[in-house]
């Protein structure tokens, strides 16, 4: 059995080829590269396309579907629209359309939004959107890797999304625009709201630079800002303050969900969550009274492949989300 998982992230598209539960290869294409090259031609370097049994696909916000759905049944790529989602480059759209126009079987993974009925109704009442599809994939990877039925998953990268899993189902959480900051994205504070009202900046532009990049004022584009801030932690005061502030913000978000999970299992993921120098996970552990673990790199793509594999093995729901395939 050969499956492929797709993670549509802020900085690019990551794909995982898995055969009989074993990861065979992982590759990443920057969004700018996808605009010039075929994703399927790149994938063909790693696997015979005719041998793929199923692909698990993440795309954008995933707010147009509420089940894990056969790509043939999905309209408008599974989104309501592409507004208010951060910087749009177009690479993910090309990948999705290539996959849909091919004959490769695929399912589209939804995001977590108010129409996903498996979540606690209070979170649906509070927030229109909680997470994009790859966060479900990351959660499923964590669920399969560590075997916990109850845990908090915090994915820290360009943005931060923190989710709570209870009794093997996604219970709720906090979206990138609500709670903790990431490197690029974050919630809007008073100054940004005033700038939006004054028409100095759009809400989407504000969200896209409301992360700790606002501390360093060193925006280098979607792909390079992260490295610029993290690599200068020890020799630049603003970069140190930015990372320390991010750690505080994420720790606060995790702790706010801790009372809902007596098992106190916390799993960190994302490029910043697994960053080793500075060691972000150790910094967060100092603020958390719980069992803090770190998930493997490229966890979203691997999780998407795990979802595809288990669907082929007959699973009818993933973390409480129904499968329509």
UniProtKB/Swiss-Prot annotation:
Family to which this protein belongs: Belongs to the UPF0285 family.
Protein name according to UniProt: UPF0285 protein MmarC5_0962
InterPro entries, A to Z: ATPase_NBD (IPR043129), Methan_mark_12 (IPR016735)
């Amino acid at each position: 059995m050969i499956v492929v998982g797709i993670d549509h992230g802020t900085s690019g598209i990551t794909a995982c080829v898995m055969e009989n539960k074993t990861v065979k290869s992982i590759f990443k294409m920057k969004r700018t590269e996808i605009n010039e090259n075929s994703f399927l031609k790149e994938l063909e370097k790693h696997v015979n396309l005719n041998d793929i049994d199923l692909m698990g696909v993440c795309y954008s916000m995933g707010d147009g579907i509420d089940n894990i759905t056969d790509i043939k049944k999905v309209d408008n790529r599974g989104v309501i629209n592409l507004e208010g989602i951060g910087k749009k480059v177009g690479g993910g759209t090309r990948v999705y359309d290539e996959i849909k126009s091919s004959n490769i079987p695929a399912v589209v993974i939804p995001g977590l939004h108010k129409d996903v009925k498996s979540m606690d109704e209070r979170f649906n009442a509070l927030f229109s959107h909680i997470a994009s599809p790859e966060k479900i994939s990351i959660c499923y990877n964590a669920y399969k890797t560590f075997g916990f039925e109850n845990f908090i998953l915090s994915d820290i990268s360009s943005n931060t999304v923190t989710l709570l899993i209870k009794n093997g189902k996604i219970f709720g959480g906090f979206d990138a625009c609500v709670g903790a900051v990431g490197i690029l994205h974050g919630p809007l504070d008073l100054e940004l709201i005033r700038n939006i009202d004054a028409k100095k900046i759009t809400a989407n532009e504000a969200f896209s630079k409301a992360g700790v990049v606002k501390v360093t004022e060193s925006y280098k584009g979607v792909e390079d800002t992260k490295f610029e801030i993290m690599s200068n932690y020890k020799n630049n005061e603003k970069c140190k303050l930015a990372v320390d502030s991010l750690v505080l913000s994420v720790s606060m978000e995790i702790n706010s969900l801790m009372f809902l999970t007596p098992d106190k299992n916390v799993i960190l993921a994302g490029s910043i969550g697994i960053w080793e120098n500075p060691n972000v996970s150790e910094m967060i552990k100092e603020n958390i009274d719980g069992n803090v673990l770190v998930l493997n790199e490229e966890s979203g793509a691997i999780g998407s492949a795990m979802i595809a594999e288990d669907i082929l093995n007959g699973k009818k729901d993933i973390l409480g989300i129904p499968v329509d395939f």
